[in-house]
Amino acid sequence: MRLRLEREGAVATLLIDRPRQHNAMNQAMWEQLPRLVQEAMADEAIRVLILTSATPGLFCAGADIHEFARCSGDEEWRVANQAAIRATQYALAQAEKPVIAAIDGDAVGGGCGLAIACDLRIASPAARLGITPAKLGIVYGLFDTKLLVDLVGPARAKRILFTAALHDAQEALAIGLIDQILPAPLEAAMELAHAMAANAQHSIRSSKAIVRRILDGQADDDGETLAMFRDAFTLPDFREGVQAFRGKRRPCF
């Protein structure tokens, strides 16, 4: 299997495993990845998802260019490929639970697109990130581009797209493409994921949903966001949090 889902307690890890091709994503993988994300979201025992490579020193080299060259003359394939890539980005970006990318190597083109669709990105010092359609004569989709603009702002997004440059980890951190540089990104992501998993899940998932609404242009509360606030006071997590605070102990959510 070139993609697989592993579980460790409340954390699932989605592994990209195609090392001979530097984890380049072919059509079958683009179609499979959203299903694995949905599997993790549907598993009530899972609270956080990590996206990473099964092979140290790699993340994802993007789309399979050999497949592009072989199949791009087929309009039906182009439509299916565009739909599968968008479905992958959407599944990661709209996942109700937190998603962390652990990047230990190059995240290029569609590989960088996978990373920016996650909530947080932890990279090794050796990581490089870039979005390179301008070197291939192709166009990055609007949904993917919005994720980039939301993350780094329009001016930096334009520079990333227009230059098609690869950015080392320090530069990627400086421009906001990643959140942290650590020598063992998967271990750090796992530690962070377990810390998140120990917190109140209604709080985390509601916060993620509210941030998403803000990025989509919503500027004030509506009935759904007001309900998130009100409902929190009726849930077991609130009662446990208050009791733990009063008892000077860690809450058990």
Where do the protein language model's features map onto the residues?
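Glycine-rich phosphate-binding loop at the start of an alpha helix
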Residues: 62, 82, 86, 109, ...
